[in-house]
């Protein structure tokens, strides 16, 4: 039996990580076989790559290098953690996946969505999520939350301009328009508890529909 692969996308400061943690805890409490993980990271090799990608000192990183590093981390994470969990029949909740690369490097960095998609096609080897939950929030609100959250892990992408984050949002909107059947869009400007309850309901409804 194969499990369900659910990914979470959105701009910086959208609140994905907090909601994923709460959803994971509640699903475990209810007896679901569920695993939560993140990209880049989730396993030792990918966490090491994450440190290189997001280190604030690495300001000279080329956009293509960045895209390739994300794809490398993604491949190892899939092979070592995600795919084995899916084969065990678990539901996998993943904080970011290939759509992040398409929106950030493909669109906002200007490498081209098709170019970055081709890199990632090799990395993911056909593994795609059955559902992607997109946390919709304006770049202004997202950056405001980042600066207000002193406990949040700061990274190199937080240092980007408002224009860059606006391009990221445009990139996501383009991806959603291309695959509307896969995406569920959540208004992440709402109170966190409301967002959490909506996300939990959508996931549970989807699992029931797929008899998982």
UniProtKB/Swiss-Prot annotation:
Segments passing through the bilayer: none
Function: Phosphorylation of dTMP to form dTDP in both de novo and salvage pathways of dTTP synthesis.
Family according to the record: Belongs to the thymidylate kinase family.
Enzyme class, UniProt record, top EC level: transferase
NCBIfam families in the record: DTMP_kinase (TIGR00041)
Documented EC number(s): 2.7.4.9
Molecular functions per Gene Ontology: ATP binding; dTMP kinase activity
PANTHER family associated with the record: THYMIDYLATE KINASE (PTHR10344), UMP-CMP KINASE 2, MITOCHONDRIAL (PTHR10344:SF4)
A single BP term in Gene Ontology: dTDP biosynthetic process
Gene Ontology terms: cellular component: cytosol
Reaction equations catalysed: dTMP + ATP = dTDP + ADP
Record: residues binding ATP: 10-17
Keywords: ATP-binding, Kinase, Nucleotide biosynthesis, Nucleotide-binding, Transferase
InterPro entries from the UniProt entry: P-loop_NTPase, Thymidylate_kin-like_dom, Thymidylate_kin_CS, Thymidylate_kinase
Entry superkingdom: Bacteria
CDD domains: TMPK (cd01672)
Protein's name according to its UniProt entry: Thymidylate kinase
Pfam families reported for this sequence: Thymidylate_kin (PF02223)
